[in-house]
């Protein structure tokens, strides 16, 4: 009981205790529904519930809690007009404002990195137990939490004054020669999007 009181007092020391609670709850609730959902609902209902909870967590983390708790924001550029596909917004590019609360930062980063690891462990367990349909559900969890972790890590390492080549130098996807047509396809898609909008 003392650990719960200590955790509660830690949350209260946050700059945004309600938002931090929603952020941590958004990480925990899909995991709880995955572990305990089969006790009180069928697989289809559990699958849909967990995917919707993961999507809610992805949206809240990417657009609200990341912006408020650690002053970072990222999005993926789908227009194909930029050479870098990720666009970042960071406290580093603006004049100094309110400082980042260390409790907010610590709990945010721990939850961002720990959640994909937990989903990966669940994925390994699904493979070992040959539960392929549950593995599909876990794969959604790995993808959504992993993309958020990747985006926020890239945003945190991003330097606004550095050239574009050094922004993504810690991890780059390989260039595959046969996939040059994807660039042309994205240009055609952006052409039609600009005409319709």
UniProtKB/Swiss-Prot annotation:
Q: Decide whether keyword Iron-sulfur is in the record.
A: no
| Keyword terms, alphabetized | Glycoprotein, Golgi apparatus, Membrane, Transmembrane, Transmembrane helix
Q: Name one GO cellular component term.
A: Golgi membrane
Q: GO terms for biological process?
A: protein secretion; vesicle-mediated transport
List glycan-bearing residues. 63, 167
Q: Which InterPro entries is this protein grouped with?
A: TVP23-like
User: Could you name the domain of life of the organism this protein comes from?
Assistant: Eukaryota
Tagged with keyword Glycoprotein: yes
- Annotated family: Belongs to the TVP23 family.
Q: What's the protein name?
A: Golgi apparatus membrane protein TVP23
Provenance organism: Vanderwaltozyma polyspora (strain ATCC 22028 / DSM 70294 / BCRC 21397 / CBS 2163 / NBRC 10782 / NRRL Y-8283 / UCD 57-17)
Q: Which gene encodes it?
A: TVP23
